[in-house]
Curated annotation (Swiss-Prot):
GO terms for cellular component: cytosol. Its cofactor is Mg(2+). The lineage of its organism: Bacteria, Pseudomonadati, Pseudomonadota, Gammaproteobacteria, Enterobacterales. GO terms for biological process: carbon fixation; oxaloacetate metabolic process; tricarboxylic acid cycle. This is Phosphoenolpyruvate carboxylase. One of its GO terms (molecular function) is magnesium ion binding. Keywords: Carbon dioxide fixation, Lyase, Magnesium. The gene is ppc. Pfam families: PEPcase.
Amino acid sequence: MNEQYSAMRSNVSMLGTLLGDTIKEALGEHILEKVETIRKLSKSSRAGNEASRQELLTTLQNLSNDELLPVARAFSQFLNLTNTAEQYHSISPHGEAASNPEALAQLFTRLKDKKLSEQDMRSAVDELSIELVLTAHPTEITRRTLIHKLVEVNTCLSQLDHNDLADYERNKIMRRLRQLVAQSWHTDEIRKIRPSPVDEAKWGFAVVENSLWEGVPAFLREFNEQLQNSLDYRLPVEAVPIRFTSWMGGDRDGNPNVTAEITRHVLLLSRWKATDLFLRDIQVLVSELSMSECTPELRELAGGEEVLEPYRELMKRVRTQLTNTQAYLEARLKGERVLPPTDLLVSNDQLWDPLYACYQSLKACGMEIIANGQLLDTLRRVRCFGVPLVRIDVRQESTRHTDAIAELTRYLGLGDYESWSEADKQAFLIRELNSKRPLVPLKWEPSADTQEVLETCRVIAEAPQGSIAAYVISMAKVPSDVLAVHLLLKEAGCPFTLPVAPLFETLDDLNNADDVMTQLLNIDWYRGLIQGKQMVMIGYSDSAKDAGVMAASWAQYRAQDALIKTCEKAGISLTLFHGRGGSIGRGGAPAHAALLSQPPGSLKGGLRVTEQGEMIRFKFGLPEVTISSLALYASAVLEANLLPPPEPKKEWNEVMDILSDASCEMYRGYVRENPQFVPYFRAATPELELGKLPLGSRPAKRRPNGGVESLRAIPWIFAWTQNRLMLPAWLGAGAGLQKAIDAGKKEVLATMCRDWPFFSTRIGMLEMVFAKADLWLAEYYDQRLVDKSLWPLGQQLRDQLEADIKVVLAIANDDHLMADLPWIAESIALRNVYTDPLNVLQAELLHRSRQQENAADACVEQALMVTIAGVAAGMRNTG
């Protein structure tokens, strides 16, 4: 195992040396020496040397204002380079990739060992559906311009990995690496202005262009090979096991910057980008498909006998169609009113048909090897991305729909919809949904908020079918929340039935989710509308913020289990949409573990999950990483459907109820009921300063003033990650476990840990958080930043963390954290040496900036922002 890490460590050390050379060249020997001294002290302090720890604190406290920024940047940039080396390690032939046999090949072997029939496996492959929803959560701290440089660093590491390089080749690559490290150093790593929703959407398109466009067909090629080798089965050309959707430009929940006009613009931009990428593909096909032999059907399609190169002829027509469509979209984006061309591309079939005709003809004429080249990749892209490139979800909060309809009923003299009972609301909505006349009068001039809701529905109605994937209702609580959206879409003249997904995200809403859906499915009109398909979104982040991570995850499990059983009984195919984040407090977990820990049957309707902020870059930042991420997802979904996890035993459910109640009580006891908690949170973390980071287009708070409940889940997690207490990801969990142990359930817990993936994943996630948390750093933040009257609260929380770690180790029967995942333990240890100085420096900078009466020194502010970005890179997640 150590040989594996030695390759990564030598890359890390090489990149560190290059960064050191750059710093020395830019700022002189004395700054580099200062950075080196701090690094050595940090290493020694991590090894347990108390004197080094004290010296580290003194050194960082005594930095002059002009040393603050270079030191912060040095450690922050080093962590970015470490992450890049680690990402490369995961795909390097000498790293993880070498020791990780193909996830899919392993799975097929295991399935055969379990005596599953090949027919069952093929059916599961045919039904495989994975939809990844890219969201612009403000967690991707790294600027796009730096990401491009880091991607190129990755390419250089890959080039250096060849043993047969000539000296001049190696020198050339090293020279390029030096340039990239220097370019990064001389680039400002902190954005100066917040990205707009359109900027965020462009960031999403860049992920498609730079990674997914290559990565998806490459994964499907590999998947097809595994299927041929294991099952003697080919993936049908028209199969769409992978799809991408985006919330960028569609998610208006709590983000007033996402307007109907923005959504309209992003839809056009997305279609424009699709024409741009497909034109490149078609250009290659025009030059490749020079063959003349074809089937009579294709000859006729191409224009008869006189056409000498029929495939080329068809490709040129597609090229013209793409060019005309692109010109039209460009004019629309500039705000010009133009007539669409007669051959405007609006549906995937328009692209698919001529390409597939060429594919079939080539195969029929014995040219399968050509058909299965670039042409097959393009066909797969048409299926995965198509004319819209990425579909978008529209998300809005339930009260906005209620307010809009209430304003309308008041205007029409029907009374105040908002004050009606749920039964009256449903009766009114169903009556209107069945009515042939419009409800919204032509001359009505609603308020700006209502106008915005109606206009958004019009944008959906005008969009080509297939470019909007779903309408998600956040904070959904009752059946009328879902019916209201269907009515608003009907009033906008929407010509197709759009999936409307309620999002249940607080503890109470999760507990009521099954009841709400049962009522909806009992409405005949509704059953007729949905045609046997229903999507429900499960919120992870807000439920964890509301009740603590243990109670929330049990409520999520129970809600999913109940919904699966209700829909099965009603003959409805249920797609559960998981709104999980990158961090543990927002439901994040390694994909494979997370999927296998869900209730049996939860993936029958396919997987739909959000991929957030910085996790998009870690999982899909490079084509090679995309291939391995998709392979993990595919193998996890197939495994969950073919070898479902066990139904929990009655006793396990009872233990989880004890755990959940006790953990929720403790969590809320601190977070909601302790009057000192909010002042402590504001003082001990950079929560207030985080608002200054121009991260996403979305405000950090739902309401400008107010306590924890008004904070969005992301800044809440982000703040606690910065001071290394990691509180949202564990508070209450250990106390709940201890209560179960005190009730004599220790043996049961050990069995649950061994035999129940749901529970073992929870314990594994707690271990990961504990490995990243740090007691002495959290205490240092208190000493430097918190009023003495609040110190006892901080001490209580740290004592609780220590007790929780012991409980988890006792249940997992380990003597140290992450014993079964040494690779992650190694990765955390490698980073800590560089993250610790950033944490100490951050506490110092917060202290300085809060001491200053007037506006803080620009140097201090800038350095503070760099430490926030650096700690986020060190923790490998933000919020």
